[in-house]
């Protein structure tokens, strides 16, 4: 029985398509829906650029407040995209969304950790990020989640591949 689901989004080009699947499944199963987006940690190059322009106090302030602001903005963007997608008649669907979480870390690990923490019954994600080429059979995050997920995974195929008929 599917009572709760975790929709993992990269906020990319195909996110609205995957979101439609997540909402339809939540509706079909009358299930709670959790949403997660992973923000990759800042790379060494970006960190060194910041260090060259900011003193230690400003850098610490950026890490504590700047990251929180970015995360809050992303969470709001996800909420807004759901509202946009649903229009005025989607209040009931919006109520299915229990939480939107933006967490820093490796995307596959964030998804797997949240699946375990929330005890969801199903994971929903796209087969590729928007940057992956259509010739790649499966994106890195999707492949890792499929290998290690403790629950079934609903994988939405890349729209461009479906249109061209490549399988």
Where are the model-predicted features located?
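Short glycine/proline- and acidic residue-enriched helix-loop micro-motifs
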Residues: 57-73, 94
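Glycine-rich, Arg-bearing micro-motifs that act as flexible, cationic patches
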Residues: 122-147, 162-165
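Short, flexible loop segments at boundaries between secondary-structure elements
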Residues: 151-162
């Amino acid at each position: 029985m599917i009572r709760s689901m975790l929709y993992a989004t990269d906020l990319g080009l195909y996110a609205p398509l995957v979101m439609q699947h997540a909402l339809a499944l939540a509706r079909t199963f009358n299930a709670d829906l959790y949403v997660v987006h992973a923000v990759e940690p800042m790379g060494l190059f970006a960190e060194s650029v910041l260090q060259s322009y900011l003193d230690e106090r400003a850098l610490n302030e950026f890490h504590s407040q700047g990251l929180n602001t970015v995360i809050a903005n992303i969470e709001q963007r996800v909420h807004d995209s759901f509202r946009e997608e649903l229009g005025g008649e989607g209040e009931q669907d919006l109520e299915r969304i229990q939480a939107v979480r933006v967490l820093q870390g490796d995307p596959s690990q964030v998804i797997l950790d949240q699946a375990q923490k929330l005890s969801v019954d199903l994971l929903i994600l796209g087969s590729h990020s928007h940057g992956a080429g259509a010739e790649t059979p499966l994106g890195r995050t999707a492949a890792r989640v499929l290998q290690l997920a403790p629950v079934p995974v609903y994988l939405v195929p890349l729209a461009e591949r479906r249109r061209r008929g490549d399988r």
